[in-house]
Amino acid sequence: MKTIFLSVILLMCSAVSLSAAGLTGRDVMLKAKNRPDGDTRYATLTMTLIQKNGNRRERKLVSWAMDVGKDSKRVMFFTYPGDVKGTGFLTWDYDDAKREDDRWLYLPAMKKTRRISGKSSKTDYFMGSDFTYDDMSSRNVDEETHTLLREEMVGGQKCWVVQSVPNDKHEIYSKRITWIRQDCAMAVKAEYYDKLDKLHRSLTVSNISKVQGFWVMGHMEMTNVQTGHKTILQMSDQKFDLKIDAALFTVARLEKGI
C-alpha cells in the first residue's frame, strides 16, 4: 500500500511540474525540431543491417544537407559496397505541413530515378534498413498531434516523454513515444506502435556530444521487434556551416553521383 501511495504522489508531482512549466507536447517537439544545427551539414555514415540470425551487412554513405529558408534539402550517396555504390537519395523537406515533401532515389544499376511519394514514403523501408523513407527525412511537427506524458530519466539525463499520433492514415504506426533530452533537445529513445497498438519498432540514440558547438548523435539503432531485424547507423566526420554548392541538391546531380 505504501508503494502504491508513493507512486501516486510521484505521478501527481510530475503532473504539477509539467503544468508549471507550461509546456505542451508540441512545444517539446518544436524544441527538438528547431535545435541549432548550422545552415549546412556533412557527415559520413556506416549502416549495418543485422538479421535475426546474426548475419550482418555493412554499407557506407556520405551525406550533405542545406537549409533553404525554413525548408531543408539533403542528399546521400552510397560509397560501399559495390552492389549499391552510386545509389543516391535526395530529399526536399518543406516547412509547410500541407505540402508533400519531395524524395527521389537513384538506382545506378538500372540508370533510373524513382520518385518516392504518397503511401510509399510512409510504408517502404530505405534500402533494406529498418528506417522508412519518411524516417530519413525531416518531419514537420504539425504532421502529428503531440501530448506531453511525463518527465523521465534516461541514461542519467532528464527527458520529456511525448506521445505523437500521426494525422495521415497511411502511416505504418498508430503512435510514437519519444524521449527528448531536456539539456540538448535531442531524441534519445523512441517506440513506434502498429495499428493494433503493439510495439513495432524501437529506436535508441547514443554517443551524444558537441561538434563545432552543435549537439550531435554518433549512434542510432532501430530494431524491428516483430521481425528481429536491426539497423545501426554510425555517424562520423560531422561538419557544420561548410560551403556547399546548391546544385548538389538536384535530380541531375543525384544521377551524376559524386
Question: What is each residue range found by the language model?
Answer:
Residues 1-5:
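Positively charged n-region of N-terminal signal peptides that target proteins for export
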Residues 70, 155-158:
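Short acidic/glycine-enriched loop/turn segments that link adjacent beta-strands
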Residues 18-22:
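Boundary at the C-terminal end of the N-terminal hydrophobic targeting segment
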Residues 26, 57, 136-148, 197-202:
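A short, amphipathic edge element
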Residues 79, 90, 102-106, 115-117, ...:
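Gly/Pro-enriched, hydrophobic low-complexity segments
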Residues 7-17:
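Bacterial N-terminal signal peptides
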Residues 62-65, 147-153, 206-208:
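Short amphipathic beta-strand and strand-loop transition segments with alternating hydrophobic
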Residues 23-109:
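N-terminal mature ectodomain segment of secretory-pathway/periplasmic proteins
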